[in-house]
Curated annotation (Swiss-Prot):
Lineage of the organism: Archaea, Methanobacteriati, Methanobacteriota, Methanomada group, Methanobacteria
This protein's encoding gene: purC
Keyword Nucleotide-binding part of the UniProt annotation: yes
Transmembrane segments: none
Protein name (Swiss-Prot/TrEMBL): Phosphoribosylaminoimidazole-succinocarboxamide synthase
Molecular function as annotated in GO: ATP binding; phosphoribosylaminoimidazolesuccinocarboxamide synthase activity
Source organism of this protein record: Methanothermobacter thermautotrophicus (strain ATCC 29096 / DSM 1053 / JCM 10044 / NBRC 100330 / Delta H) (Methanobacterium thermoautotrophicum)
Length: 248
């Protein structure tokens, strides 16, 4: 895709969003920054952004093939994705298949408990307010999204969960939970945005139960980038590695 990258539009905790000469397209650059605890714990890990970008690109392509509307257009190069410009909705949509992390600390669930059907949790994306949990009434009162948009977000989320669980299972990975963000394109259509990577998903090795995600960093352990590289090796096909010239 022949577009010229211009100046910055937005800078988040681990990515920069850049304008291009096409008003409908942005470039998303993945940085090596990693955070936890609402940004209280920080570090920079070489190649982390590189692997997150190729993992996200692969997963976006899998989802697009399954009919999920996303903002993804192409991986320009490892570390940079071209995407549709979205008006982001400040909701973090968390899907839980297995009880782990904060849900166990905040509610009387047992670690490893399976949720059938999966739990869908929505949090207000606001560091200022501590990312509080939302319900439909609060979302509607805040004017964040309409009732129809919420129904569409839930429908897409459940479809994503089904597609992702099957795909990752075929690659030897378990998906306990993951976080999604959505936005509106220029026509008002709801699309999946942000990223889908070990930064936003819990991923466990199916054989060993070993975590291959940001939980490693949360626990203060070594091997974060090695785990992300391993996820990339597990989900990328030889064709992906060749066309994107991925270093593994």
């Amino acid at each position: 895709m022949d577009v010229k990258i211009d100046g910055p539009l937005y800078s988040g905790k681990a990515k920069d969003v850049l304008l291009t000469d096409d008003p409908e397209i942005v470039a998303v650059r993945f940085r090596d920054d990693i955070t936890a605890g609402d940004g209280e714990k920080k570090d920079t890990l070489e190649m982390k952004g590189y692997y997150n970008s190729v993992i996200s690109a692969k997963i976006f392509e899998v989802l697009e093939e399954a009919g999920v509307p996303t903002q993804y257009l192409e991986l320009r190069e490892p570390g940079c994705i071209l995407a549709r410009k979205l008006e982001m909705i400040p909701i973090e949509v968390i899907t839980r298949n297995i009880a782990a992390g904060s849900i166990v600390r905040r509610f009387p669930f047992t670690e490893g408990q399976e949720f059938v059907p999966p739990l869908i949790q929505m949090d207000y994306k606001s560091d200022e307010h501590g990312d509080p949990m939302l319900n439909d009434d609060i979302i509607l009162a805040l004017g964040i999204a309409t009732r129809d948009e919420l129904e569409e977000i839930r429908r897409i989320t459940l479809h994503i969960n089904s597609v992702l669980r099957d795909f990752l299972k075929s690659r030897g990975l378990i998906l306990p939970d993951f976080k999604l963000e959505f936005g509106r394109d220029s026509s008002g259509r709801i699309r999946l945005g942000d990223e889908v990577s070990p930064d936003t998903c819990r991923l466990w090795d199916m054989e060993t139960g070993e975590p291959l995600d940001k939980d490693i960093f949360r626990r203060g352990e070594e091997g974060v980038v090695g785990a992300y590289r391993r996820v990339a090796r597990m989900i990328l096909d030889d064709e992906d590695i060749e066309r994107w010239n991925v270093e593994l």
